[in-house]
UniProtKB/Swiss-Prot annotation:
Signal peptide region: none
Protein name as annotated: Probable Fe(2+)-trafficking protein
GO molecular function: iron ion binding
Described function: Could be a mediator in iron transactions between iron acquisition and iron-requiring processes, such as synthesis and/or repair of Fe-S clusters in biosynthetic enzymes.
NCBIfam families, alphabetized: PRK05408.1 (NF003817)
GO BP term, example: cellular response to oxidative stress
Lineage start: Bacteria, Pseudomonadati, Pseudomonadota, Betaproteobacteria, Burkholderiales
Superkingdom of origin organism: Bacteria
Amino acid sequence: MARMIHCAKLGKEAEGLDFPPLPGELGKRLYESVSKQAWQDWLKQQTMLINENRLNMADPRARQYLMKQTEKYFFGEGADQASGYVPPAQG
């Protein structure tokens, strides 16, 4: 049976992650309050940020930037948007 949580991002009950997606306290916090769907949405956003900003994931500053963006996306005012990105129209 799937582990259900109240997703901090989606604001509803949803299937929780199978394991903490990141090490440390942030990973634990994500595991406890982020759904699989919200995590997949973040991975798409993260990929756009990496590509648009040409982040080198071997650079500790790039990794630190993404950790901050992850926390902002789920628990803050929202992560940075890729420049030039236009969300699809709802309808």
